[in-house]
From Swiss-Prot:
This is Hemoglobin subunit theta-1. It comes from Homo sapiens. The gene is HBQ1. The keyword Heme applies. InterPro entries: Globin, Globin-like_sf, Globin/Proto, Hemoglobin_a-typ, Hemoglobin_oxygen_transport, Hemoglobin_pi. GO terms for biological process: cellular oxidant detoxification; hydrogen peroxide catabolic process; oxygen transport. Residues 2-142 form the Globin domain. The lineage of its organism: Eukaryota, Metazoa, Chordata, Craniata, Vertebrata.
């Protein structure tokens, strides 16, 4: 399902509103993912996964940077995320289902922090956006 002009506008507007806090929200989403889906911790056994740890915050910022790049390059997600796709598929060997779990937790996190903005239309647009990001990230798995 392609992102419509309205989807793109809604995603970009929210991302602009998030501003420099994107990393805060992606870190919270990671913490939610680890708590709700403990199997996702498997790929991070070398990190301190306690809530608020500097290592979780650092990885949360990496997720934020990747998603911000995706927002900037909505028209070319596969190319924009190709290096990350290769890294996760070929080197880290992350289960592709983990991306969907993190995406779900990010939606929950954003809805919690922006309840007045989180309309059904925004939720649908973000869900489509995250689906496209996940599709680009798992492209190297095929």
């Amino acid at each position: 399902m392609a992102l419509s002009a309205e989807d793109r506008a809604l995603v970009r507007a929210l991302w602009k509103k998030l501003g420099s806090n994107v990393g805060v929200y992606t870190t919270e989403a990671l913490e939610r993912t680890f708590l709700a889906f403990p199997a996702t911790k498997t790929y991070f056994s070398h990190l301190d996964l306690s809530p608020g740890s500097s290592q979780v915050r650092a990885h949360g910022q990496k997720v934020a940077d990747a998603l911000s790049l995706a927002v900037e390059r909505l028209d070319d997600l596969p190319h924009a995320l190709s290096a990350l796709s290769h890294l996760h598929a070929c080197q880290l060997r992350v289960d592709p289902a983990s991306f969907q779990l993190l995406g779900h937790c990010l939606l929950v996190t954003l809805a919690r922090h922006y309840p007045g903005d989180f309309s059904p239309a925004l939720q649908a647009s973000l869900d489509k956006f995250l689906s496209h990001v996940i599709s680009a990230l798992v492209s190297e798995y095929r």
